Amino acid sequence: MKALLLSLLLLLPVVALAQAPTIEISGANFRPLPVAVPAPLTQNDGAKALVAPFDSAFSFDLTASGILQVLDRKGFTADAKEGMAAASINFSRWADVGAEALVKVSLAQDGGVLRGELRLFNVGTGREDLKVSKDAPADNASLLAHRLADALYRHFTREPSPFLSRITYVRKAGTNRDVYVADWDGGNARALTKGGINILPALSQDGSQVAFTTYRKNRPDIYVQSPGGEAKAVISGGQMATGAAFSPDGKRIAYSLAEGESAQVYVANADGSGARALTDTPYGLNTSPTWSPDGKRIAFVSNRGGSPQVYIMNADGTGVRRLTFQGNYNQTPDWSPRGDLIVFTARDERNAFDLFTVSVETGKVTRLTQDQGSNEEPAFSPNGRLIVFTSTRNGGSQLYVMTADGNNQLPLRTEKGTYQTPDWSPLPQAQ
């Protein structure tokens, strides 16, 4: 993956840009920026009641971003009543705890609206480098947290964060497996299905629809549903259809269809019409399609060579080539929105499942997880910087997130339960 230089641009005037430190997001020179984030200040009683949900989401966003080292508040020595203005801040106290940047947030409730102001300071110079205000419904403090965190991330990286995106996943309860949609961190989750076996959800490009495989007719069919809408069968009719994936333009879906002793990758219009097979191996299994970000290629899993491996083909089924040659059981590929990597699950020499990336161009494989239970079912964030996945490292299968190079692995803020097959939505059009 090409290294992105994270310009911290802590000096806004042009004359000072040459002095701005940079952080290389990937590679040996990467160093997260040490940042102090004291508890939010509140301007009225209404805001005080909303500090906890805001702070939980905001702290998680910054910690999981991978670009910041959020310092432990227990070590802070500055006055907790310190204000938002630079003149009221004792920067030497923040420097003493190792902070290079200071993030201050103030909250105020105005009727049904929660308003927030964020200020970013360079601890070394005492200069204010960012001042931004956002608001959100008062009953959704985490949305305000995501909006402010996104503004901070954009300031540092000059690209959108994943904080305003959504994830979908399956939550298992007894014999039921239901599809859920939630904020990227697992908050504000709500069920899309109710009862039965519903698996392998995938979000459309605009996030307005979820395709999933369901057994409601006692066979696997592919349905599409919008949050709050009715589920509609798009691939149904007796054969076993699984694992739909929307094309980047949202006009097509790729999926696997079992026919006798084989399973082939198909592509169809998003409404299920115009279906045609892209693979044709009489006794082989071809499954788990995932689109390249430009929609011109599809990666998939096939055992045509004797064991499940990741392959790539053109979106019309031509130009098939094998991508992975290490390991004897590779599955669940997901193509990075940046186009350079595919992340997948592999069974290693100890029969443990772990996550790896493979370069689309060179075939170089990089290990991301090891010695922490089974780690499976990865999906890239919409900016390609993070990966969501399932892990059994703490018992049951839970949702985790990490940076695309395998660092900074954290559990999502989900309730207790058993989770499967997460998928990440593209970024919303309006940030």
Swiss-Prot record:
NCBIfam families the record matches: propeller_TolB
Signal peptide: 1-18
Biological process annotations from GO: cell division; protein import
UniProt key word Cell division: yes
Family statement: Belongs to the TolB family.
Subcellular location: Periplasm
Record's function text: Part of the Tol-Pal system, which plays a role in outer membrane invagination during cell division and is important for maintaining outer membrane integrity.
Domain of life of the native organism: Bacteria
InterPro entries: 6-blade_b-propeller_TolB-like, PD40, Tol-Pal_TolB, TolB_N
Keyword annotations of the record: Cell cycle, Cell division, Periplasm, Signal
Main localization of the protein described in the UniProt heading: periplasm
Name the UniProt record assigns to this protein: Tol-Pal system protein TolB
Region (Disordered): 410-431
Subunit comment: The Tol-Pal system is composed of five core proteins: the inner membrane proteins TolA, TolQ and TolR, the periplasmic protein TolB and the outer membrane protein Pal. They form a network linking the inner and outer membranes and the peptidoglycan layer.
Gene Ontology CC terms, in alphabetical order: periplasmic space
